[in-house]
């Protein structure tokens, strides 16, 4: 249990690899302690779900268009058959303005494909201020490894 009390090994692994795949107990609690330790050491943290990301790199870092849900009968002549496209600012845009490093914690990472995981791993290498932790499932005790090792293992 001393591993969870300090979080030092987790933080040093996160700083050296940039992107970690984590297996945590399903009852929760361990990841919250790690997040609290990261915040105390000067990181900004954001927790979000991996479901519905689409292209993760574009969703997180670039201006992109979305189509709002269809709400019944609408005038087709106004916006075409597909509906209007709304431009959305990237999720990490405002968080990277400050000098503090950012940890993005992605829940339900097991839904991401191998190519999406590789793209996220490349994002960590291109932008050194972004550190990403992806929950890839459950385990009896908390375990983590670099994301590229996790991808190559399968």
From Swiss-Prot:
User: Which terms are listed as keywords in the entry?
Assistant: Membrane, NAD, NADP, Plastoquinone, Quinone, Thylakoid, Translocase, Transport
Report the principal subcellular site: membrane
Q: Where in the cell is it found?
A: Cellular thylakoid membrane
E.C. no: 7.1.1.-
* InterPro entries documented for this protein: NAD(P)H-quinone_OxRdtase_su_N (IPR020874)
Q: Which GO terms describe its molecular function?
A: oxidoreductase activity, acting on NAD(P)H, quinone or similar compound as acceptor; quinone binding
Pfam families per the UniProt record, alphabetical:
NdhN
Q: Establish whether keyword Repressor is in the entry.
A: no
Q: Which GO terms describe its cellular component?
A: plasma membrane-derived thylakoid membrane
Reaction catalysed by this enzyme: a plastoquinone + NADH + (n+1) H(+)(in) = a plastoquinol + NAD(+) + n H(+)(out); a plastoquinone + NADPH + (n+1) H(+)(in) = a plastoquinol + NADP(+) + n H(+)(out)
Report the membrane topology from the UniProt record.
Answer: Peripheral membrane protein
What does this protein's UniProt record list under function? NDH-1 shuttles electrons from an unknown electron donor, via FMN and iron-sulfur (Fe-S) centers, to quinones in the respiratory and/or the photosynthetic chain. The immediate electron acceptor for the enzyme in this species is believed to be plastoquinone. Couples the redox reaction to proton translocation, and thus conserves the redox energy in a proton gradient. Cyanobacterial NDH-1 also plays a role in inorganic carbon-concentration.
Q: Which family, according to the similarity comment?
A: Belongs to the complex I NdhN subunit family.
Q: How does it assemble?
A: NDH-1 can be composed of about 15 different subunits; different subcomplexes with different compositions have been identified which probably have different functions.
Task: Output this protein's name.
Answer: NAD(P)H-quinone oxidoreductase subunit N
Which species is listed as the source? Prochlorococcus marinus (strain NATL2A)
């Amino acid at each position: 249990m001393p591993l969870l009390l300090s979080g030092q090994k987790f933080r040093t692994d996160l700083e050296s690899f940039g992107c970690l795949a984590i297996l945590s107990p399903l009852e929760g609690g361990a990841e919250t302690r790690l997040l609290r330790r990261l915040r105390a050491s000067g990181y900004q943290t954001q927790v979000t779900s991996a479901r519905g990301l689409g292209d993760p790199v574009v969703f997180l870092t670039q201006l992109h268009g979305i189509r709002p849900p269809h709400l019944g009968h609408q005038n087709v002549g106004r916006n075409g058959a597909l509906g209007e496209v709304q431009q959305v600012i990237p999720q990490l845009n405002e968080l990277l303005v400050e000098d503090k490093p950012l940890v993005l914690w992605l829940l339900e990472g097991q839904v991401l494909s191998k190519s999406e995981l590789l793209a996220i791993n490349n994002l960590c290498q291109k932008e050194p201020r972004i550190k990403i932790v992806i929950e890839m499932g459950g385990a009896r005790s908390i375990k983590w490894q670099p994301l590229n090792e996790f991808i190559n293992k399968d």
